[in-house]
Regions:
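Extended, charged alpha-helical "arm/stalk" segments used for dimerization and assembly
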Residues: 27, 87-136
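Pre-Walker A-like glycine/lysine-rich segment at the N-terminus of P-loop NTPase domains
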Residues: 1-45
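Polar low-complexity intrinsically disordered regions enriched in Ser/Thr and small residues
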Residues: 37, 69-70, 131
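Short solvent-exposed loop/turn micro-motifs enriched in small/polar/acidic residues
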Residues: 13, 71-74, 103-104
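Short strand-coil-strand connectors
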Residues: 11-17, 82-86, 114
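Conserved P-loop NTP-binding catalytic core
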Residues: 30-31, 41-99, 109
Length: 136
């Protein structure tokens, strides 16, 4: 299976309120420190493997403004891929809900392939990429 990244679309993700990045056969990402380069790599890994660019599990990806998380909207990473010549859109979205007294919260992840809701198991199985192999 040949997989090529065509685009990443980010919503409320780390330092990005909304941003789209197009990828080509060769794409260079360059910027000053702290401007979001690692966030782009984390968006890819978080969507597919629930880890950051350093392969640490379950990273905090919700955008913050003034040191406070933006909770009133979902956080998402959408990958537009070319899989064996066919365009495939894979999306992971995270919704935050608070307890009634506001003392705790829960982040629920939802997964989509070509806008069709999927279970985590089906989402992970779609590309057949093993995270342990990816880490090598």
């Amino acid at each position: 299976m040949k997989i090529k990244l065509l685009k990443i679309i980010l919503e409320n993700f780390m330092c990005y309120a909304h941003e789209e990045f197009d990828f080509f056969d060769l794409t260079k990402i360059a910027a000053m420190n702290g401007k979001g380069k690692s966030s782009i790599a984390t968006a890819y890994n978080w969507c597919l493997f629930n880890c950051d660019y350093e392969l640490k599990d379950n990273p905090v990806v919700r955008r913050e403004v003034g040191g406070k998380p933006v909770d009133d909207m979902d956080t998402s990473s959408t990958l537009v891929l070319d899989v064996d010549g066919k365009e495939v859109i894979m999306k992971k979205a995270q919704k935050r809900t608070y307890s009634k007294d506001g003392s705790s919260y829960k982040d629920d992840n939802k997964y989509f392939i070509n806008d069709v809701p999927k279970t985590l198991k089906d989402f992970n199985a779609y590309l057949g990429v093993d995270m342990n192999v990816f880490k090598m």
